[in-house]
């Protein structure tokens, strides 16, 4: 698969317009059956915008190996002017929907930045009523260096959270699939039922919960019926 190298064209255009704290934002975990959706905000320094080769290798996190992401995480966080993450748990995803939950995680990340942003570059979505200039870029994590950097921070952070959940719920294999709907994960769900970290409005889990209500019931993660 060909890796597309993100550029700093968007950052340079905003800088030419007078903005100096340009935050890239992206998320990880929108399509998972379990765990939070995690967003990251990253403000890169002028030195990186002027000479992006210092972050050579940064790309859409989905195109990188875990080892590459871990290495780039350290490089990005050491060079960034500011960075922060936000996470929205499964029960909020279920009650509000994945897109509002994603926006919430992004807003939390922005509020946690030690230096406030003055403009935003976001992968695919906009933050309604957020009082800053912003651009939503389709496939922004492949096109824009700041967004690609945020995608790596979000992915590594979320993977570490899922590793921690694996220590508490080892029967689900969270450390290997990170909450995505793999065959292994779906088999564990059918055997053990959902944990408090599973998204009960996501298919196929919501379908199983509905059909099992009229059947023998689905376990609650410990073998007890929840229906």
Swiss-Prot record:
One of its GO terms (biological process) is mismatch repair. It catalyses: Endonucleolytic cleavage to 5'-phosphomonoester. Gene3D superfamilies: Ribonuclease H-like superfamily/Ribonuclease H (3.30.420.10). GO terms for molecular function: manganese ion binding; RNA binding; RNA-DNA hybrid ribonuclease activity. It comes from the Bacteria. It is found in: Cytoplasm. Its EC number is 3.1.26.4. GO terms for cellular component: cytoplasm; ribonuclease H2 complex. Manganese or magnesium. Binds 1 divalent metal ion per monomer in the absence of substrate. May bind a second metal ion after substrate binding. Coiled coil: none annotated. Residues 20-214 form the RNase H type-2 domain. NCBIfam families: PRK00015.1-3. PANTHER family: RIBONUCLEASE H2 SUBUNIT A, RIBONUCLEASE HII. Belongs to the RNase HII family. Endonuclease that specifically degrades the RNA of RNA-DNA hybrids. This is Ribonuclease HII. It comes from Roseiflexus sp. (strain RS-1).
